[in-house]
Design a protein with these regions (language model features):
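N-terminal cap/lid segment of alpha/beta-hydrolase-fold proteins
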Residues: 2-21
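Conserved loop-alpha-helix segment in the C-terminal half of the alpha/beta-hydrolase fold
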Residues: 236-273
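Short glycine-enriched nucleophile-adjacent loop
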Residues: 113-124, 130
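Flexible "cap/lid" loop of the alpha/beta hydrolase fold
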Residues: 121, 130-169
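Conserved HGGG/HGGXW glycine-rich cap/lid loop of the alpha/beta-hydrolase fold
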Residues: 23-71
Length: 308
């Protein structure tokens, strides 16, 4: 993406994978930390910027652009949980080749928590800990225990969004959803208020103007990136897991947390923020995150989960 500036600091490198050509930023020195942005119409590594910029002072931080986003391959192809999970597996391989074979700490936001959880369930030896920020799949009344690998895709909706082959109005639909004012509106729903991060808003506008920017979001909007078996995946995780979320905006229904809140390897924090608390209460979030990592490092996560 020749016209797209870097989302965060550090070196940006690209590599081929089963998920296509991927882009990732790396900065800092020390134990590796993998950061995974959320999935929406305007996603990119810019969504993890506060964490990337802070932790590169003490860790080697890897912040990926998922397939269909940022500088990664944005071709017209099916975008699925399998594709996203394969991208994370590929990045883990790169991280371990560079940093050694020790298991890594990884953090993801929103829907990408499902991809990270699946990657960890499939390759548990690769991950020391998982941090899930405002994870999807915990809405009250849901039961997502369908066949392994199944999704919530609605093919009819994808066809409607894309339009017939002769017209292909999907690009126009996407452009309507990513006008500057619309992006601001949806960020406001994420934050639960008007005091959004203006730097992120500006980058979102830029990244949605890149060629192929509509393809992954159309699959997202039609349900194709949501896993129908994610409850089974979450329950299978045996490494330390920290789940955090806010209380404002569109992402506040976590009644389904009862699925895992009795498990000794899970920890929980609630922040008086929207869905991306590390933008709003950086110090408070980092303090809770650091405490979790320290506990995970000392193998102290063995008793009943705590709340903060």
């Amino acid at each position: 993406m020749s016209g797209l500036p870097p989302a965060v600091s550090g070196e940006r490198f690209e590599f081929d994978s089963a998920a296509g050509r991927l882009s990732c930023y790396v900065a800092g020195n020390g134990p590796p930390l993998m950061l995974v942005h959320s999935v929406n119409a305007a996603a990119s590594a810019a969504e993890v910027r506060p964490l990337h910029e802070h932790y590169c002072g003490s860790r080697m931080v890897f912040s990926i652009d998922l397939p269909g986003y940022g500088h990664s391959n944005r071709s017209d192809r099916p975008y699925t949980p399998r594709l996203m999970t394969d991208a994370l597996h590929a990045l883990v391989t790169k991280i371990r080749a560079r940093c050694g074979a020790a298991p890594i700490d990884a953090l993801a936001a929103s829907l990408s928590c499902e991809f990270l959880a699946r990657a960890a369930a499939e390759a548990p030896a690769s991950f020391r800990s998982l941090s899930l920020v405002s994870p999807t799949g915990f809405r009250g009344g849901q039961s997502r225990r369908r066949a392994p690998g199944s999704t919530l895709a609605m093919p009819w909706l994808l066809r409607t969004l894309r339009g017939p082959p002769a017209l292909q109005w999907g690009g126009a639909v996407f452009r309507g959803l990513t006008r500057p004012g619309v992006i601001r509106y949806f960020l406001g729903r994420t934050w639960g208020g008007k005091n959004i991060d203006e730097t992120l808003w500006a980058y979102d506008i830029h990244t949605t103007r890149q060629p192929g920017a509509e393809f992954a979001p159309l699959h997202f909007l039609s349900g194709g990136l949501f896993s129908a078996d994610i409850h089974t995946v979450y329950e299978s995780l045996a490494m330390p897991v920290w789940m955090s979320h806010g209380v404002r905006g569109d992402f506040t229904d976590y009644r389904g947390k009862s699925l895992v809140d009795g498990r000794p390897n899970w920890r929980f924090s609630i922040f008086q923020t929207g869905a991306l608390p590390y933008f709003e209460v950086e110090s408070q979030f980092r303090e809770a995150f650091d405490r979790f990592l320290l506990e995970a490092d000392g193998a102290g996560i063995t008793g009943s989960p705590s709340a903060a």
